[in-house]
Amino acid sequence: MSHRGWAAAALVISMAPALAAGSDVLTQARSAAGGAAWERTPALAAQGRITASGLSGTWSRADDLQRGRWAVRQDLGVFRSANGDDGQRRWRQDASGGVHALNGAYSLRAAITEAWLTRRGWLRADAASASLSPIAQRSDEGHDFDVLRATPRGGEPVELWFDARSHLLARSVRELPISLQTVRYADYRRVGGLQLPFRIETRDSSSSDVETVQVDGWRIERHAGAPAYAAPTPPDDTLLQAETTVPLEIDGMVVVQARVNGRAFDFILDTGGHNILTPDAARSLGLQPVGAGASGGAGEGSLSEQYVRVEQLQIGDASMRDQHFYVLPLQYGTVERGERVPLAGILGLEIFERFFVRLDYPAKTMTLRKLGHTEARIAGTPVPIRFDDDMPLLDGRIDGVPGVIALDTGNSGTTVVQGVWARRHGLAERLKQGIETVSYGAGGASPNWASRLQSLEIGGHVIERPLARYAEDRAGAFSSRTEAANIGTDILANFVLHIDYRAGVIGFERRPGLSAPPFNRAGLRAYKESAESFRVAVVTPDSPAARAGVSRDDRIIAVDGVPAARLSGRQLFDKLIQPVGSELHVTLKRGAEERQATLRLAEMLP
């Protein structure tokens, strides 16, 4: 299920020549929707039923037509969630009950547009000061539409589709940071002189999910009270007397042990993720997931998604009760660990919403302190963080150019520079001259080009010549139009991080002396496709791998005489970055043919 306030998939059709002034179409829309009755209506409330992600439940919406405040709440049984704007902040309640602000630069602009839509700005005089594009005609599914693009002052653009016959709003289309979203409105009925939709269908281009709301009833509210738009109170579901410190395993991935319903499992710690169990882990606990949603991440693909609740989650002495988890079949290469038990999933946003977190990369420890229990000390350089979704964003610089940087403890490797931002600032052409490679995330493969940046700066701390990957993904986490980069372990390993989501700050305490891993010295990129083999995804021309005759789609079944079944992806990575001149002996399988190859490692990216 989409974790956004409005969701949908957009239909993109080329714009036809302008046919009329936008104001003419809006005059028709105003008359069709109820005309002056809107001026006499201060607020609206609705209740209904929602179906989404294979689940069904209750839905409600409150709209302040004067100030643009709003709130949507839904209860799908296995979890509740909500989104809204109380006039002071745009807020979100995720499926765990945790609440955080959406206050990034994009979200502030989007909130202006959401408030304009809530006020029905297109029905107001002068479109409530929004700028309007010329009208175009479009046809879809046997219907004709008058379409215009409205941009509220200081807000994000929104495309409005009016039915050419009824003149009522049929769709709204908006561009999100990594997707397009559309909301379809249908089954209009008259309520107190207003025409209101009783069927609202929403989609998102990043997901196959469809959310359908069947409104049971709208009612006119004569007083828009503040509680209707207030964020819910987060659940008091954590127990921790003072603080607890636990060891971390940091070898690219940041891994922490936790107990679920009393059983110990190892999880990836991911500021960019949610609490997730793999299907195998859920089965081992005797849990019965429900629903049928879809989710994505890095890469352009998506994964099936289900939902479950666990009685208790424990990390050290910290305990959380009645916790929501997503159940996702994470990529095999993400969770496998060679001869060790696979990872059970991910711990993410839900942990950081509930605790002050100290991540000591050099010491490989994590300390949790309950938020609000005692004053947490932010050591190092305090850097403000904001949110456009669920990952912390901060201001930084890449090669001296300012940009929004996502802090992602789930990124086990190098910095990823986003293509849209790089093109906007004239860096793309140089970055694409790097070495072709590929990375893998929840959404599958992401083609990258590796090179060295001149510098990366966070909170006044400058990292010189860090390795970076340039991505031009068309979908997924690395297709953002608002972020400059995503930083992971290679950068964060230089710091002790003091993370306080409630205060909106992360302290960066630099620890000198880190020697970052070198770039792959074999000239091949391979991923663990099954227990028995690695599949070669990329071979760099004129590299040790190319000279040894390794080809794309070859299967590596042994390395230095050790069967692939006994090796993890990280262990293979470590072998590929051994000192220059080292020899690496691999057993390859191409079809039914098996052969030996020797790679003499060389510096590929000094």
Task: Please name every model-derived segment.
Residues 53, 153, 161, 186-606:
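Pepsin/retropepsin-fold aspartyl endopeptidases
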Residues 1-9:
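Bacterial N-terminal signal peptides that target proteins for export
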Residues 57-61, 79-83, 156-160, 179-187, ...:
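A structural detector for short beta-strand units
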Residues 21-28, 91-158, 164-166, 175-176, ...:
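Flexible, processing/modification-adjacent segments and terminal tails
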Residues 72, 148-150, 171-172, 198-202:
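Beta-strand-dense domains in secreted/periplasmic systems and polymorphic toxin scaffolds
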Residues 8-17:
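Bacterial N-terminal signal peptides
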Residues 60-69, 83-88, 158-171, 214-227:
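A short, surface-exposed beta-strand/turn
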Residues 24-98, 133:
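N-terminal mature ectodomain segment of secretory-pathway/periplasmic proteins
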